[in-house]
Amino acid sequence: GVTGTVIASGGVNIDTGMPNILTLMAPEGSSVINPLTTLVEEYVLANAGTVTASEASAAVSAALGLATNVDLLIFDPLDAANSITTNGLAVQKAAAQVATLLTLVADTQATLTNAQAAVASVTQKLIASIKSVADGTTNSVNLADSPQITALVAGVTSGNIASLVTDTDTANSSIGAASNISNISQAQTIALDDISPTLKGLGLTAATDSGASATD
């Protein structure tokens, strides 16, 4: 594991080969860092230290429909042995959907400052949605569902929101229908191929990438 919060930004995604434009985090002791570990760390921070990383991992898994016995802080869905399993495929789909949502949100904005604010807003709403599932208020978080996507991006005040919702729904539905890791990467690459060059390689303030280990 690693001491302190693990943070990574920039570089290239090892699954898609595309530039990584957003910042990743993971709680102390994690051996992987990806969009899901970022949500786990954001969930811990949002709960002011009253929730452990393990509890946050279980909450994120439950909200996204993943097996709660899979520890997101050590499970690498891109590992050769894991990538061919049902859990590996499900975890990578969820990670890719989170990354795609946040990257498309950033791309709707004209400036880096606006992109940072938009990503932060959507991340906060996503964490609140995960907490609603943990509290029993709602049943699940579906990032390929237009009404849920619309609710998540409600705080984004500039850019073409209707197109953002449609593009995210289309991309994440394709990711959700993928039958293997390669298909997930292909769907994500198609969705993100036209990302603004001004955003590429710039660190923002929320989850992205789709499954790199802490040592990559």
Predicted feature locations:
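Feature for extracytoplasmic/surface-facing segments of secreted or surface-associated proteins
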Residues: G1-D216
